[in-house]
């Protein structure tokens, strides 16, 4: 079981087959991450599984940030040097991915919002 901020990419694969998940790349230094945080908290409250990738950040600051703003993530991966992000093709934070099984169905660069959710993610979920 993975909890808190961990450094194991295996945590992503522990979810049930055919379940949709979100992977959100975030950091405490990212102003836009704060702007989309309410959206992520709402999705968590709707029952969505959201995996966080804390990107090129300070671990202590990340814990403080989650304590202050709330933690929408079921699991957080700590990517201090950007290795996981590099492997995903991350260009910066925030970025959000829609996952099903081991496949990336959608990638959104920038702030997640209801409009982005409805325009880019819902059609793939309903398909």
Give, region by region, the residue ranges found by the protein language model.
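Structural microenvironment flanking redox-active thiols in thiol-disulfide oxidoreductases
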Residues: 34-69, 80-86
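Short, conserved active-site loop motifs that form the nucleotide-linked donor/cofactor pocket
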Residues: 48, 74-75
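Thiol/disulfide oxidoreductase modules built on the thioredoxin-like
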Residues: 68-72, 79-125
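Nucleotide phosphate-binding site architecture
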Residues: 31, 41, 105
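Hydrophobic beta-strand anchors of alpha/beta hydrolase catalytic cores
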Residues: 22-23, 50, 96
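Single conserved hydrophobic/aromatic residue that forms the stacking wall/gate
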Residues: 1-12
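Active-site-proximal beta-strand/loop segments in catalytic clefts of secreted hydrolases
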Residues: 25-27, 53-56, 79-81, 109-111
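Short active-site neighborhood of thiol/selenol oxidoreductases, capturing the structured segment around
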Residues: 13-34
